[in-house]
């Protein structure tokens, strides 16, 4: 099995697991400004070669010159669009800092002990409700972060998928970004530390 480097694309930065422990360090690209409702990495497109160079040097500092033998297991926000998935894949793959790239959404990583569950998370633009079964996203609803109703989301969660209506499912609140105060009483809260511990042990065979 190829060696894996877990990477998290958070709301404002990229977190990379260190080589010899389970801690994560932040990769910040100089000159990137936060814009409302727009993932920060969109700005990489305007200076793609420069961003890829900085990332490659960052990874070489962490993992040495043999970093190209690793597979990057990239954990992305739950509302990542198909085009964003492609951009993320191409950006990292062509940074010359890895052997290959694999992606999972945050919601798909929340539980190894449950084959099916509901996840709720918050990105820079949406609240995302998902039903996960055997690692696959079978249903999803998104709500604008400026107009959502906690009551409506709670009701929607009960009928997000026919499986839930008949047999129920555990409900996980992903509080990795510490921005889920409105939802903490809806289910089991996954703290920042718990989430990082889960991702630190992600392997590409699971991605």
Q: What are the language-model segments listed below?
A:
Residues 11-18, 24:
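Short N-terminal binding/cap micro-motifs at the start of the first secondary-structure element
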Residues 1-10, 25, 32-124, 131-207:
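Nucleotide/phosphate-binding catalytic cleft detector across ATP-hydrolyzing
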Residues 17-20, 28-29, 132:
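Surface loops and adjacent helix of pleckstrin homology
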């Amino acid at each position: 099995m190829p060696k894996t480097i877990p990477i998290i694309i958070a709301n404002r930065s990229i977190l990379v697991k260190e080589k010899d422990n389970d801690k994560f360090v932040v990769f910040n690209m100089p000159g990137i400004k936060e814009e409302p409702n727009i993932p920060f990495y969109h700005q990489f497109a305007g200076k793609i070669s420069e961003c890829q160079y900085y990332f490659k040097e960052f990874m070489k500092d962490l993992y040495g010159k043999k970093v190209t033998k690793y597979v990057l297991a990239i954990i992305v926000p739950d509302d990542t669009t198909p085009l964003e998935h492609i951009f993320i894949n191409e950006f990292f793959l062509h940074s010359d800092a890895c052997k290959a790239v694999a992606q999972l959404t945050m919601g798909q990583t929340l539980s190894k002990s449950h084959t099916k569950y509901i996840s709720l998370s918050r990105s820079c633009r949406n609240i995302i409700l998902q039903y996960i079964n055997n690692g696959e996203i079978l249903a999803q609803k998104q709500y604008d972060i400026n107009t959502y109703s906690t009551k409506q989301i709670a009701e929607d969660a009960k009928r997000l998928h026919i499986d839930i209506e008949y047999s129920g499912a555990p409900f996980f609140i992903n509080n990795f970004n510490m921005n889920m105060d409105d939802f903490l009483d809806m289910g089991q809260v996954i703290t920042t530390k718990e989430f990082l511990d889960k991702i630190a042990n992600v392997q590409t065979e699971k991605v």
